[in-house]
């Protein structure tokens, strides 16, 4: 709800963030596939396992910024294993540029999610 798009938030004029709270997950890991020249994430995935389920956040891939991959969250909530990660999400809405096509970025999301789950397990 806070991020409304790429480099855009819901903060109004004159507002500032004074605090942020995150629940501590039972297990978590962040994996990124870096763009060599900039070292920014071509795709980054954060996986966090909580008592009530799993959260999967994706960065660097979408035209609208950070998003949660709900299909992976559902699959990993049932079975927290790299083998449970679904096939790559569709390329719709993914960034396409000289560093990677939307299809490539979608594929990387699944790969980085599997790596994050394996590292957190």
Model regions and ranges:
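C-terminal structural segment of proteins
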Residues: 1-121
């Amino acid at each position: 709800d806070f991020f409304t798009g790429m480099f855009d938030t819901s903060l109004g004029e004159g507002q500032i963030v004074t605090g942020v709270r995150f629940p501590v997950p039972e297990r978590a890991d962040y994996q990124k596939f870096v763009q060599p020249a900039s070292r920014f994430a071509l795709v980054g995935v954060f996986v966090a396992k909580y008592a009530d389920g799993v959260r999967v956040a994706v960065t660097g891939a979408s035209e609208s910024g950070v998003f949660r991959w709900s299909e992976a969250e559902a699959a990993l909530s049932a079975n927290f294993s790299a083998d449970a990660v679904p096939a790559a999400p569709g390329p719709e809405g993914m960034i396409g540029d000289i560093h990677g096509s939307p299809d490539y970025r979608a594929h990387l999301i699944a790969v980085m999610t599997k790596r994050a789950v394996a590292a957190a397990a």
